[in-house]
Regions:
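Eukaryotic scaffold repeat domains enriched in small/polar residues
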Residues: 2-325
Length: 325
C-alpha cells in the first residue's frame, strides 16, 4: 500500500449531513411483464465450467483496501478509485496507492461520481454529497425512512436512487428535491414493477444519457428516459452464458463506453459482458475464479477499458484487462 498522502476525517451526522433476447423501442414486450417460469430443480455446477476461448479478459492486478467489509466502488474521469467499506470512503490513485480516507459515520453501500466529479453516497436511507476533496456539501433523506439505497447514478441535472426496500427508482435534482418515482407497479398497463427478492438493485446512466435499471427478479434490463418513460428493455432467463438465472440476477452492472453491459451475478458467480442489445459478448471472470459464497461483486470501468471487480470475499479490488488477440 502506498503512502497515504492525505487523510480527511469528516463525520456525517445522521440528521444533517448524511429463450431469447427481448428488445423493444418505446414499449416493452409482454414477455418482460411476466416473471420467469416457476423454479425447478437444477444444479448450477453444470454451468460453472467455461470454455477458455470464451474468456476475453485476464486478471492483471489487485488492490487490497484496509477494510474489514467492502461495499461499493466507482472510478472517476482520472481513473481514481473510490471504495466504501466499514464506515469510511477510501480513494486510490490509478497505481493503487491510497491517497485519502474519509470518515462517514455510517456504512455507505454504494458510491458514484457525477459528471462534475462530485461524490454521491448511499447511506442506508440517506444520500450524501461530497466534493472531490471529501468535504460534505449536502445530504437528504430518501422519500421514505424505510428506504434501503443500493445504487445511485448522477447526471448533470438529475440524481437517480435505487430503493430496494420500496422497489422504486427515485429521481431527484442535485439539491435533493424529488422529481418523480420511476418503475412502480402499474395494474393498468399490467407492468409488474421491480421484482427484488433480495437487496440487489442496480442502475446506471449510459453514454447516450439514458437510465438503465436492472429488474433482478425478472432478469431484465430496463431503459428509461429522464422523464421516467420506459423506452426499451431486454431479458434472457437462462443459466448458460447467454442469460441470467436464480432468484435475482444480475446483482450489479456497469456500462462500457460503447453501451455494452458488464454484469456480475450471485449463486452462479461470474462476470460477463453483453452488448447494448443484450447479446452475450464475452466472459470477464469465470465461476472458478471466485471463492465459494462470493456475493456483492460491485463493478466499475476505467478510461482504459479495464474492468474493476470489488470482491468482498477476498477483500480485494480485482482488475481485469482485455486479452491481447
Amino acid at each position: 500500500m502506498g503512502k497515504i498522502l492525505t487523510y480527511v476525517g469528516i463525520a456525517l451526522a445522521v440528521a444533517a449531513v448524511l429463450a431469447g433476447i427481448i428488445f423493444s423501442s418505446n414499449r416493452t414486450s409482454s414477455a418482460v411483464n411476466k416473471p420467469p417460469e416457476a423454479a425447478i430443480l437444477y444444479n448450477i455446477d453444470d454451468y460453472k465450467k467455461v470454455d477458455p476461448a470464451l474468456i476475453g479478459y485476464t486478471e492483471v492486478r489487485q488492490i487490497k483496501p484496509a477494510f474489514r467489509e467492502l461495499y461499493g466502488m466507482a472510478c472517476d474521469a482520472d481513473d481514481k478509485i473510490y471504495v466504501t467499506g466499514d464506515e469510511q470512503l477510501a480513494i486510490f490513485d490509478p497505481a493503487g496507492d491510497e491517497i485519502s480516507r474519509i470518515d462517514l459515520g455510517h456504512e455507505a453501500k454504494c458510491v458514484t461520481l457525477s459528471p462534475d466529479q462530485l461524490i454521491y453516497l448511499g447511506l442506508n436511507h440517506t444520500v450524501a454529497v461530497l466534493d472531490r476533496n471529501g468535504k460534505a456539501l449536502r445530504s437528504w433523506v430518501a422519500e421514505s425512512e424505510s428506504a434501503v439505497i443500493t445504487s445511485v447514478a448522477a447526471g448533470e441535472r438529475d440524481v437517480f436512487v435505487a430503493d430496494a426496500m420500496n422497489k422504486v427508482v427515485l429521481q431527484y435534482d442535485p439539491a435533493g428535491n424529488l422529481l418523480r418515482r420511476i418503475g412502480e407497479k402499474d395494474p393498468e398497463s399490467e407492468r409488474p414493477g421491480f421484482i427484488i427478492p433480495s437487496f440487489y438493485f442496480d442502475l446506471a446512466i449510459d453514454p447516450d444519457g439514458f437510465l438503465w435499471v436492472v429488474n433482478p427478479g425478472l432478469h431484465t434490463f430496463e431503459n428509461y428516459t429522464f422523464e421516467g418513460k420506459l423506452r426499451a428493455s431486454w431479458r434472457k432467463t437462462a443459466f448458460d452464458l447467454e442469460g441470467f438465472g436464480g432468484c435475482c440476477n444480475p446483482t450489479h452492472m456497469a456500462i462500457l463506453p460503447d453501451g455494452s453491459f458488464v454484469t456480475s451475478e450471485k449463486g452462479l458467480v461470474r462476470v460477463k459482458i453483453h452488448d447494448p442489445t443484450g447479446q452475450f459478448r464475452t466472459v470477464v471472470a469465470a465461476p472458478n475464479q471466485f471463492a465459494e459464497g462470493t456475493v456483492g461483486l460491485d463493478l466499475a470501468v476505467d478510461s482504459r477499458g479495464q474492468i474493476l471487480v470489488l470482491d468482498p470475499k477476498t477483500g480485494m479490488i480485482r482488475i481485469f484487462a482485455k486479452r491481447s488477440s
